[in-house]
Amino acid sequence: MKAVVLTVAVLFLTGSQARHFWQQDEPQSSWDRIKDFATVYLDAVKDSGRDYVTQFETSALGKQLNLKLLDNWDSLSSTVSKVREQIGPVSQDFWDKLEKDTVSLRQEMNKDLEEVKRKVQPYLDEFQKRWQEDVERYRQQVEPLSKELREGARQKLLELHEKLSPLGQEMRDRARTHVDALRTHLAPYSDELRQRLAARLEALKEGSSFAEYQAKATEHLSALGEKAKPALEDLRQGLLPVLESLKLSFWSAVDEATKKLNTQ
């Protein structure tokens, strides 16, 4: 139905000047628009119906049932098109006769509509005039309030900023003072700690204990390497079958792909 509604909307929005604009012929009459509307409406119903059938057939239930509704719908649409072609002359003759028989009626209706329009137009103009005046009056009343609100908000922000600026500067100054004082208090202890550490390292380097530590470290590393060697060998042996299997799978996939390419 969305397609139908869209088609109807386009038809009425384009109005009687659409064909005149594109085909450069005389503007359509109301009667011609009614006939075109009927034709376009039927085409839209047919197209939208096919869309719904397609959606159903592509659904899980439609695939399971396998009703082949789309083929049947296309056959039905083809049959309907043939019937429309066959009855086209008869239909045109009907529309022509009906249009001829209702000429006087449509003329009277158009005359009545024009008369009603003339009577109603002053009220419409008055309504539009008053509405525009009310909108302008409302705008004039609201504009000063909006300006006052904007100016008030800006003023309050400025006042708040002026009050907070000294406080923020004072806090930054106090924090800087505390950091400087802490650095001053810690400086002697930092120097003492660096001196003690340097002395310990120098004594360790000059004494026999440094060589002892170095020898022990080398011994520990060698022992670790000997202990890790069997574990690394076991790991290598365990990975060999896995790597071989991966290699076989890879080449098998390559051979299969090659065969498929050669057969094409």
From Swiss-Prot:
Q: Where is the signal peptide?
A: 1-18
* SUPFAM superfamilies referenced in this protein's UniProt entry, alphabetically: Apolipoprotein A-I
Look up keyword Plastid and say if it applies: no
Broad class of where this protein is predominantly found: secreted
- Kindly name one Pfam family recorded for this protein: Apolipoprotein
Q: Which GO terms describe its molecular function?
A: amyloid-beta binding; apolipoprotein A-I receptor binding; chemorepellent activity; cholesterol binding; cholesterol transfer activity; enzyme binding; heat shock protein binding; high-density lipoprotein particle binding
Posttranslational mods: Glycosylated. Palmitoylated.
Q: Does the keyword Repeat apply?
A: yes
Annotated region 10 X approximate tandem repeats: where? Answer: 67-264
Q: Which compartments is it annotated to reside in?
A: Secreted
The ranges of the sequence repeats are 67-88, 89-110, 111-121, 122-143, 144-165, 166-187, 188-207, 208-229, 230-240, 241-264
Gene3D superfamilies of this UniProt entry? 1.20.5.20, 6.10.140.380, Apolipoprotein (1.20.120.20)
One GO BP annotation is: protein stabilization
Keyword terms of this UniProt record: Cholesterol metabolism, Glycoprotein, HDL, Lipid metabolism, Lipid transport, Lipoprotein, Oxidation, Palmitate, Phosphoprotein, Repeat, Secreted, Signal, Steroid metabolism, Sterol metabolism, Transport
Modified residue annotations for Methionine sulfoxide: M109
The superkingdom of the source organism is Eukaryota
Q: Which GO terms describe its cellular component?
A: chylomicron; endocytic vesicle; extracellular vesicle; low-density lipoprotein particle; spherical high-density lipoprotein particle; very-low-density lipoprotein particle
Quaternary structure, per UniProt, is: Homodimer. Interacts with APOA1BP and CLU. Component of a sperm activating protein complex (SPAP), consisting of APOA1, an immunoglobulin heavy chain, an immunoglobulin light chain and albumin. Interacts with NDRG1. Interacts with SCGB3A2. Interacts with NAXE and YJEFN3.
UniProt family annotation: Belongs to the apolipoprotein A1/A4/E family.
Q: What does this chain do?
A: Participates in the reverse transport of cholesterol from tissues to the liver for excretion by promoting cholesterol efflux from tissues and by acting as a cofactor for the lecithin cholesterol acyltransferase (LCAT). As part of the SPAP complex, activates spermatozoa motility.
Q: What is this protein called?
A: Apolipoprotein A-I
Q: What are the leading ranks of the lineage?
A: Eukaryota, Metazoa, Chordata, Craniata, Vertebrata
Name of the gene:
APOA1
